[in-house]
A protein has these predicted regions:
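Domain-length accessory/inserted modules outside core catalytic folds
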Residues: 1-80, 84
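Active-site neighborhoods and metal-handling regions in enzymes and metal-associated proteins
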Residues: 82-683
Length: 683
């Protein structure tokens, strides 16, 4: 009989808990394990410490048996298996019944949770539960007689495949924004509901304008979907652990003091922090409540004296975390946030809240209590984005290990792919295994994009058993992957020719490479934004009437989110200048629908442009240092399209890759690496 089949012995568990002097009883442990199962990023058995520290072997065994038994009742991490099988039309019908009971004619179901983040825990996956759509951006609107699912161009095919198109209209949220659709679809005199925890004030006002055009009204309500989602997973309870100063490079006390002083200079008494990555950075803590990003879900209030109120479920704090946080950090239950906001409001002092990331509920609560709101960006955003020397040294080390893992994979791929038997999932699994063997590895930084042939042309493709292809000769294989290490976060893309590429593939690849090199070599004055640099990466494609429909670069955290603001390189307007210490991706691409995709991505860090030439210039200049290390496929390079400066850059980059990674890989891989990084035109 397996551990999953063994019914836990509550009496024995109670005895083991008492013997270990645990503060929990069996019911408390069961509730804790339910939260552990709802946390997708728990690694190993470190959660045992939440029960007893140290954990006696017999208790650890009992806890593992309990976890296995409870996990067997879950389906896809979303809900117990019996309810997960409830047909989605029935879910929609139940939601409509709940709307009628509340006197609502419609309800808005966004993809995000109360933190407005990219990754959402199982308990927050309302859109996926209702519609079946699992993409990273989308929104549904349910009316009495109609329902629509809004996605952007990346996800139209996926939405049509995952959602029931007999009940959900699939709409393009750029061509037809949801608020505009509501203006034509909401019933006159009707009431449309929204959950104020799940929308920013700006989003609410857009919906309000659409609803009022239809002669209807928009009301904040308790979420009716939560009422019909039976056996909804609990909030995740991944262990929250200290992030050592040896990796962070600055103590939490110093960060709190620095940011508190900045608030005081602005005449602000306190800032409400709603982004878990900001709180994790500020307090030097990490967790695992959401996929691929080491975040503990929480809220916080930072005051100008540097003190912090942290609103978090204490059950997930590992022993000793109180000492790490210090006396100036007060740990409060999540339900204490509302009263704390009331107290801030009644003090009469100015309270800073970020209108771009904070939930409408936060603003409503402060305003109802008479608060003076200062609308400004999260005070942690910019300091977090500008990495300190310790963080930069760490990310360089992480990129060396990550580059060695990817290079081992590429050498293995060169041997295996020509057989035509290797699948997309098998390839990504092998790459993950190489990464997991590396020091300080904690997780992937996002689901690997492993796309062969036409699947590579799907920008946010994710291989499934139903969609995956074999990686075969005459294909291009696009591999976009990354990892979370204690000392840094990585994200790198390589496009590999399987066999001999055709002339069109080489032309398009080389134009993408020219754009990548142009951005990597860019010198630009202080004050330059990513928007101003975006054309560097596109020029060679534009010359042939080609382009790509995604941004050129996104910010990256330090053992935090692989997508970090406020910096980015994109056509979209962005007023944030690039500053020294900011890490950003350099990832131009080209995609031929139904045929292949090409993307070349390295992470770079903004640095001062030093040297004699710099001293002679009238303005302070900046440049990029490339962090990512892995060969770029030379077989795809059309040498005649590169000028001498571009060839010199590629050869110098490959020399650096070879010299850095050779000591980190095995002999067979080293031989392959030597050939893969040989000077262009030498063979």
């Amino acid at each position: 009989m397996t551990a999953a089949q063994t019914k836990p012995d509550r009496r024995r568990l109670a005895h083991l808990l008492r013997a270990a002097r645990s503060a929990l009883d069996p019911d408390g442990v069961i509730a804790l394990v339910a939260g552990i199962l709802a946390a997708p990023a728990v690694i190993g058995t470190n959660w045992h410490r939440l029960v007893a520290d140290p954990t006696p072997p017999a208790l650890a065994e009992a806890l593992d048996e309990l976890q296995a038994h409870m996990a067997a009742g879950y389906h896809d991490g979303l809900a117990p298996a019996d309810f997960a099988r409830l047909p989605r039309p029935a879910r929609l019908a139940r939601l409509r019944e709940a709307l009628a009971a509340q006197g609502l004619d419609g309800f808005i179901v966004p993809r995000g949770d109360q933190h407005q983040g990219e990754y959402v825990p199982p308990c927050g996956q309302r859109l996926a539960w209702l519609t079946g759509f699992t993409g990273s951006a989308g929104l549904a609107i349910v009316l009495r007689e109609r329902a629509a699912l809004f996605v952007d161009g990346r996800y139209t095919l996926q939405a049509a495949a995952q959602a029931d198109t007999a009940v959900f209209e699939i709409r393009h949220l750029v061509d037809e924004p949801a608020w505009r659709w509501l203006a034509g679809a909401a019933p006159k005199g009707g009431v449309i509901g929204y959950d104020p925890w799940l929308h920013t004030p700006h989003e609410v006002e857009r919906f309000r304008s659409g609803v009022e055009r239809a002669g209807a009204s928009l009301h904040a309500v308790d979420n009716p979907l939560d009422q019909v989602w039976l056996n909804r997973p609990p909030a995740p309870l991944a262990p929250v652990v200290p992030h050592p100063d040896s990796f962070a490079g600055e103590s939490a006390e110093a960060k709190r003091s620095r940011l508190g002083h900045a608030l005081a200079e602005e005449g602000v008494a306190a800032a409400v922090l709603t982004m878990p990555e900001s709180i994790a950075w500020l307090l030097n803590i990490r967790g695992g409540d959401v996929p691929h990003t080491p975040l503990p879900l929480s809220f916080a209030i930072l005051r100008q004296d540097g003190s912090v109120s942290l609103f978090i479920d204490r059950r997930k704090l590992v022993p000793g975390l109180d000492r790490h946080l210090g006396n100036a950090v007060a740990i409060e239950p999540p339900e204490g946030l509302g009263p704390a906001l009331d107290a801030l409001a009644t003090s009469g002092d100015r309270v800073q809240v970020d209108p771009g990331t904070a939930a409408s509920w936060i603003f409503d609560r402060l305003e109802q209590a008479g608060g003076r709101i200062h609308r400004a960006a999260d005070p942690c955003l910019l300091p977090k984005a500008c990495k300190n020397p310790t963080e930069l040294d760490g990310t360089r080390a992480a990129h060396c290990r990550d580059g060695a893992a990817l290079t081992r994979f590429l050498a293995w791929l060169a041997r295996e792919a020509p057989t035509g038997e290797l699948t997309e999932i098998a390839a990504s699994d092998r790459l993950e295994a190489f990464r997991r063997a590396g020091e300080n590895f904690r997780d992937l930084s996002f689901p690997t994009i492993s796309g062969a042939g036409p699947n590579g042309a799907i920008v946010h493709y994710r291989a499934t058993p139903e969609s995956e292809k074999r990686i075969e000769p005459r294909m291009l294989y696009l591999l976009d992957s990354g990892a979370q290490y204690l000392d840094g976060t990585t994200d790198i893309t390589r496009t590999i020719a399987i066999g001999e590429p055709n002339d069109e593939m080489r032309d398009r690849f080389t134009r993408v490479l020219k754009g990548h090199i142009a951005l990597a070599m860019a010198r630009f004055p202080k004050g330059t934004t990513g928007t101003q640099l975006d054309a560097f990466a596109r020029r060679a494609l534009w010359q042939e009437g080609l382009d790509y429909d995604h941004g050129t670069g996104h910010g990256v955290g330090s053992y935090l989110s692989v997508h970090e603001g406020p910096q980015r390189i994109s056509k979209a307007p962005n007023a944030q200048p690039l500053l020294p210490g900011m890490i950003v991706s350099n990832e131009p691409g080209y995609y031929k629908t139904g045929a292949y995709g090409i993307r070349i991505e390295n992470l770079v860090v903004v640095q001062p442009a030093n040297g004699a030439a710099q001293r002679e210039r009238e303005r302070d200049m900046l440049c990029f240092e490339t962090l990512s290390l892995a060969p770029i496929d030379r077989s795809l390079v059309a040498r005649e399209l590169l000028d001498e400066e571009e060839i010199a850059w590629l050869n110098a980059y490959h020399t650096r890759v070879r010299e850095t990674l050779t000591p980190l890989v095995d002999r067979e891989t080293a031989r392959w690496l030597a050939a893969a990084t040989a000077p262009l035109g030498s063979d």
